[in-house]
Each structure stands twice: as structure tokens, then as C-alpha cells.
Amino acid sequence: MRNSHATFSQEGSFYRPTLLKKVEKALESGDKKPIKTWSRRSMIIPNMIGLTIAVHNGRQHVPVFITDEMIGHKLGEFAPTRTYRGHAADKKAKKR
């Protein structure tokens, strides 16, 4: 039986190699600009802590500041793709 709370070291962690290169480059230069990525399925690894990664949500890039609690989660979990505008108002209740 598989543990649902497995960390990134226990299961195969996926991250886009080009994203990892951008992260390493930002760490070397000390650059604080957000790193743009379309790779929502990339897992957050300890190297990313303290960086801001702009994750694409289908429309725009959502800035996500990486903290240590996020390690092992996917980038896409922190950039919602759907906007909820509420249910349609009931016409009978509106006339009262």
C-alpha cells in the first residue's frame, strides 16, 4: 500500500531540467526576479526555497514564493486555473 503523504525523496520526483538550470542560475547570481515557467507538473525541491517562480495558469503567470512547507508539492497546486464567480442568482428571490 502506498503512503499518500510521501515526500519527494520517497517517490520519483519530476522537474523540468530547463527549470532547474534557471533556478541554479538565479541562485548563483542572487537575482530576485521571478522565474517564468509553464511546467506545472514540476515538483518543488529544496533548491527553490526563497525564490519566486511565476507559474502559468493557462492565462497568465501567477507568482509563487517558495517556502519550505511547499517541498514535495507540484508547482501547479499553487496557481489555480479556474476562477469562481459564484452561482447565478435565483430570479424568484430577486423580484421580492
UniProtKB/Swiss-Prot annotation:
GO molecular function annotations of the record: rRNA binding; structural constituent of ribosome
One Pfam family it belongs to: Ribosomal_S19
Entry keywords, A to Z: Ribonucleoprotein, Ribosomal protein, RNA-binding, rRNA-binding
Task of the protein: Protein S19 forms a complex with S13 that binds strongly to the 16S ribosomal RNA.
Protein name as it appears in the record: Small ribosomal subunit protein uS19
Source organism per UniProt: Pseudoalteromonas translucida (strain TAC 125)
PANTHER family recorded: RIBOSOMAL PROTEIN S19P FAMILY MEMBER (PTHR11880), SMALL RIBOSOMAL SUBUNIT PROTEIN US19M (PTHR11880:SF8)
Keyword rRNA-binding assigned: yes
Encoding gene (name): rpsS
